[in-house]
Amino acid sequence: MGSLGAILKHPDDFYPLLKLKIAARHAEKQIPSEPHWAFCYSMLHKVSRSFGLVIQQLGPQLRDAVCIFYLVLRALDTVEDDTSISTEVKVPILMAFHRHIYDNDWHFSCGTKEYKVLMDEFHHVSNAFLDLGSGYKEAIEDITMRMGAGMAKFICKEVETIDDYDEYCHYVAGLVGLGLSKLFHASGAEDLATDSLSNSMGLFLQKTNIIRDYLEDINEIPKSRMFWPRQIWSKYVDKLEDLKYEENSGKAVQCLNDMVTNALLHVEDCLKYMSDLRDPAIFRFCAIPQIMSIGTLALCYNNIQVFRGVVKMRRGLTAKVIDRTNTMSDVYGAFFDFSCMLKSKVDNNDPNATKTLSRLEAIQKICKNSGALTTKRKSYIIENESGYNSTLIVILFIILAILYAYLSSNLPNSL
């Protein structure tokens, strides 16, 4: 669960964290017995625990298809991200990856830790892929082909303009949105969403990741990964790596805020996409990552720590998002709360303040007009959660132990 300090500071994180831990244990027990499927679901939980939990709620056939889709694209991403692979080797692999998924003898050793295991044992993913229905296989092959070609293009091309940035994000994430929409439609659970809305779902997530991961990407060895567009960062510094130096802190934060403001462009499309979903499990699967993204942007905005270390939502807040997100009203409430948090951090002296505030106010207007912002709802913004004395701490841990014992025996399927 979360760290002791974080739990004591945010005691209402206890119950969601407890439910999340129990759900994780339950998900691990549901791993299939067939070797290739056992590998795939075990690997899914290793590379993304939260994604692994949400995916478990989907229907069996769709769950299998989304699991394989995710692992195939993680493998493709592992090849792209490994800066030790020469361009001459990397580009042909990316271009041919959609054919490799049909070959259960193919593997390519690269990446580190669990990603290296995924690549070394890729035949398990291929075998599971071949088990899928034809509609699922066709959708996965098509997106893998297009993504591999797009990644190959940007191996040899820098992200210069905002149009380049949008194009790169389309290849690595917008296509994921298109692919998931195709899988949802193939399952019979949803109408086929437009490419434009599907693309925005992916771009919002990807741009958030690119913003949050600046320091990790710029410090990559043997070669930096640079995804922030020159058109934005060149307004503030001469070289992208200059943003991490303390003497450029003021300019770095202004550049960061410019990047966040750009990402906010996609929120209205994302809200429209989610409001059109009918299946409750698919809805949760799509909505939880989007809320995590707006929450992460709220943390990153105007925060110099993006250039100093890791900025991410605490585990307890993540658990709350997973626990509370069930309906579109919950989504509107979360986006309103996090946009309020972000708005409170806007400095009127920031060069993009007017643009940032305009985009946040447009998001807040949509949320207000939805009618979802009732006084009874639970807010993600709590003014004061500190000041608990030692007696209360002891009581809270007793309650925690009782809840854990109760939920372990009575709520194995809850999140």
Swiss-Prot record:
GO MF term set: squalene synthase [NAD(P)H] activity
Catalyses which reaction(s): 2 (2E,6E)-farnesyl diphosphate + NADH + H(+) = squalene + 2 diphosphate + NAD(+); 2 (2E,6E)-farnesyl diphosphate + NADPH + H(+) = squalene + 2 diphosphate + NADP(+)
Keyword field: Endoplasmic reticulum, Isoprene biosynthesis, Membrane, Transferase, Transmembrane, Transmembrane helix
Cofactors required: Mg(2+); Mn(2+)
EC number: 2.5.1.21
Membrane-spanning segments: 281-301, 392-412
Reported function: Component of the triterpene saponins (e.g. ginsenosides or panaxosides) and phytosterols biosynthetic pathways. Catalyzes the biosynthesis of squalene.
Family: Belongs to the phytoene/squalene synthase family.
PANTHER family, per the entry: FARNESYL-DIPHOSPHATE FARNESYLTRANSFERASE, SQUALENE SYNTHASE
Protein name: Squalene synthase 2
Annotated organism of origin: Panax ginseng
